[in-house]
């Protein structure tokens, strides 16, 4: 009987020591997998822009999941879509930061990628405007020379974050 109590006491102590480490491991895994998914979708957008010789957007998705929404909170998810218009006037060919119909030829799926909403344990903050990849693979408005940064963190904050940066050249990195 005493041996059983000693074994139970030792097991309880080991569980108390292991639980915080396991929680940290799970949080790091959650951040890593989400930031890797975002990195993959950004790379898809860049490669599609080059392949199609057209502009592609990565932006916060609206509730319908078919167009961009405003705001810096990317937790509702994101989407990758084709952008070729500036206004409600079809055919003018100037980018407006909205998803447009894909021209005939090739895949007509738009949005191309639809990132799902994040769990309530994660926060993703990014630019309020869409991240735009140009036909040459560069990012942003030509000549602007600014990087786009997205920061993924735990909610509530633990100080552990992952940052995905898209340089003006189009290079995508994760820290």
Question: Where do the language-model regions lie?
Answer:
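Glycine-centered recognition micro-motifs in short, flexible terminal segments and loops
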Residues: 1-12
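N-terminal helix-rich module
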Residues: 13, 17-47, 55-175
């Amino acid at each position: 009987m005493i041996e059983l109590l000693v074994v139970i006491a030792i097991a309880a102590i080991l569980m108390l020591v292991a639980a915080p480490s396991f929680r940290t491991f799970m949080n790091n895994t959650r951040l890593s997998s989400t930031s890797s998914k975002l990195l993959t979708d950004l790379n898809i957008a860049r490669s599609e822009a080059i392949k199609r010789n057209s502009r592609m957007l990565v932006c916060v998705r609206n509730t319908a999941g078919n167009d961009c929404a405003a705001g810096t909170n990317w937790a509702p998810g994101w989407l990758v879509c084709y952008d070729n218009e500036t206004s409600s006037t079809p055919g003018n060919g100037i980018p407006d930061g909205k998803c447009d119909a894909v021209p005939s030829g090739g895949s007509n799926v738009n949005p191309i990628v639809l990132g799902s909403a994040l769990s309530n344990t994660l926060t993703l903050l990014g630019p309020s405007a869409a991240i735009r990849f140009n036909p040459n693979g560069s990012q942003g408005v030509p000549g602007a020379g600014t990087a786009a940064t997205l920061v993924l963190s735990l909610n509530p904050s633990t100080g552990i974050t992952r940052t995905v940066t898209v340089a003006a050249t189009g290079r995508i990195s994760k820290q």
